[in-house]
């Protein structure tokens, strides 16, 4: 009787193991088939956003904001419809081979939940929660708004109304979902993005030295030509794009193993630094400066400091190459302002070079790569392994010290030489000092409910017109429709909930990316893009031209981290 019970138990275990085996097969087959379908749809959208969207123009710069918004809106809506259709195909069990209830390549019926998990993420990240809260804040801001039409369309500002919030929320949910083999597709798509971005950089470079091959500046007042560039319009917006593309290429350069692909990414880095001068926007130095600091820590942690040195050479070579090109060919008459005036201060350039050289020497002295020594005794019966410690903690502390010392040195030099960038007043940062002070005061005057949920989407223009219209024209000569600080912008328009949830989106995405940085070679580039945009957002405007890239890169980052966790 006992023997029979043992046999029964054995059969039961075999049956359970067999069921587990089939369950595993079901997951794999759903992931490999329906996953490919959804990956293809997502890849098509990424190509749309990274190839077509950057180059989209209609009437030169005259309607560029509306044109970009329309292209983005059409792309997201079309993508959402196709994605929903793909999801229906997956859930109904219909595949490319016309089979229903079974997946191509398998004989096992797959449940709806298994199919859904093959497409939608299996787990929630902090960024997902913050993104939901950010969307809710946009809805609440719309409810608080007096002008509902403007709050929905955002036409009074930069088309960042509730409609825009809906679009980025849909894009985030779909792009960050679980898809199979996204890493392989992203490798190809990112290289195409390098080429497209380089085209936009080259257009800006040519315009800066007096050539306008596509006649984009025709009809623009000569006094205003210096603030329009490339296929993005305003120099600050173009600078914002650089803060997305360049850090992405830098991260991919660090982690890429293929020499050919690394050369392509290197070209993107070189061209991106050349575009610093045509952009002529301090936001570029803020975003990319933060990126360089992040790359320093990342390369030390990942034991790839050689790539950091190569990036420094590529970056400095690109910037100096643009300076030389302007000297040889001439310019369009645009004056170099802000941090680009560093070229006029040789002593400060020497300090920067000395800091870079010091970092390199420190790295050379303290880097200890992982080394494993294997000893085998004579009769080969025992093996001894001696693994040396790499001292990563010490190197990170040294890197932090170098960053702090160099930062203090730059500030001291700037203050002693009375550089305008270090003197905060109403004129600071092209009157950002003025608008920040006024917007902060406006927030303090809002009712308590609006302090929490905001005065209304894209409502800065109406608030400033009501209180400071004459003063704005007298002091700055222009009318402001944005706080020129994304965090202050969301604080006033979407309240404390909107500002904190936006900070949460950026912060949790960065934390997640740091934790998973070694899980995928594509995480670092996306992480750097989010960091760079988050820093430049302190000095720039949220708008429908480059702000979508921030949420796209965040969605891609979370999607990659999600996939890395599952693997």
Regions found by a protein language model. Give the residues of each.
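Membrane-interfacial, low-structure loops and terminal tails that flank and connect transmembrane helices
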Residues: 2-35, 93-125, 366-393
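Alpha-helical transmembrane segments of multi-pass inner-membrane proteins
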Residues: 2-3, 9, 25-37, 41-56, ...
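TM-adjacent membrane-interface loops and short helices in multi-pass inner/ER membrane proteins
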Residues: 234, 431-479, 494-498
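Membrane-interface catalytic loops of GT-C/OST-like multi-pass glycosylation enzymes that act
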Residues: 61-67, 152-157, 235-236, 280-287, ...
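N-terminal hydrophobic segments of proteins, predominantly signal-anchor/transmembrane helices
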Residues: 48-61, 80-166, 199
């Amino acid at each position: 009787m006992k023997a029979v019970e043992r046999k029964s138990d054995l059969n039961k275990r075999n049956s359970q193991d067999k069921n587990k085996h089939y369950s595993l097969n079901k997951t794999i087959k759903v992931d490999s088939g329906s996953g490919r379908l959804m990956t293809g749809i997502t890849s098509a959208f990424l190509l749309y956003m990274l190839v077509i969207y950057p180059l989209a123009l209609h009437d030169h710069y005259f309607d560029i904001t509306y044109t970009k918004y329309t292209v983005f809106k059409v792309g997201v809506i079309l993508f959402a419809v196709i994605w929903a259709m793909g999801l229906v195909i997956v859930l109904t069990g219909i595949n490319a081979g016309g089979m229903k209830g079974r997946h191509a390549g398998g004989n096992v019926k797959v449940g709806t939940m298994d199919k859904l998990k093959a497409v939608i993420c299996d787990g929630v990240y902090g960024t997902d929660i913050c993104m939901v809260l950010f969307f809710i804040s946009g809805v609440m801001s719309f409810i608080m708004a007096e002008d509902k039409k403007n709050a929905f369309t955002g036409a009074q500002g930069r088309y960042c109304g509730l409609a825009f919030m809906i679009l980025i929320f849909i894009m985030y949910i779909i792009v960050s979902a679980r898809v199979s083999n996204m890493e392989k597709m992203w490798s190809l798509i990112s290289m195409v993005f390098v080429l497209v971005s380089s085209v936009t950089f080259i257009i800006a470079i040519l315009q800066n030295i007096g050539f306008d091959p596509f006649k984009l500046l025709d009809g623009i007042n000569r006094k205003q030509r210096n603030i329009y560039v490339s296929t993005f319009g305003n120099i600050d917006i173009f600078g914002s794009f650089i803060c997305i593309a360049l850090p992405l290429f830098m991260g991919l350069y660090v982690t890429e193993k293929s020499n050919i692909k690394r050369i392509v990414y290197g070209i993107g880095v070189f061209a991106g630094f050349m575009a610093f001068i045509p952009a002529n926007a301090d936001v570029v130095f803020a975003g990319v400066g933060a990126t360089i600091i992040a790359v320093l820590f990342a390369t030390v942690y990942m034991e790839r400091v050689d790539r950091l040195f190569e990036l420094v050479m590529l970056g400095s070579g690109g910037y100096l190459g643009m300076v030389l090109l302007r000297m040889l060919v001439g310019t369009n008459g645009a004056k170099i302002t802000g941090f680009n005036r560093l070229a006029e201060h040789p002593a400060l350039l020497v300090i920067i070079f000395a800091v870079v050289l010091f970092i390199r020497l420190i790295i050379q002295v303290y880097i200890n790569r992982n080394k494993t020594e294997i000893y085998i005794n004579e009769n080969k019966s025992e093996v001894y392994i001696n693994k040396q410690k790499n001292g990563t903690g010490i190197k990170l502390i040294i890197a932090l010290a170098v960053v702090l010392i160099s930062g203090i040195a730059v500030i001291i030099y700037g203050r002693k030489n009375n550089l305008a960038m270090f003197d905060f007043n109403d004129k600071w940062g092209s009157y950002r000092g003025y608008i920040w002070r006024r917007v902060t005061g406006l927030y303090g005057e809002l009712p308590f409910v609006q302090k929490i949920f905001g005065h209304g989407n894209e409502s800065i223009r109406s608030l400033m017109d009501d209180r400071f219209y004459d003063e704005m024209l007298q002091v700055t000569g222009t009318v402001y429709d944005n706080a020129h600080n994304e965090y202050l912008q969301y604080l006033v328009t979407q309240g404390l909930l909107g500002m904190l949830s936006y900070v949460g989106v950026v912060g949790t995405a960065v934390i997640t990316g740091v934790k998973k940085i070694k899980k995928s070679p594509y995480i670092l580039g996306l992480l750097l893009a989010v960091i760079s945009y988050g820093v430049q957002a302190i000095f720039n405007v949220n708008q429908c031209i480059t702000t979508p890239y921030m949420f796209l890169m965040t969605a891609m980052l979370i999607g990659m981290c999600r996939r890395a966790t599952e693997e």
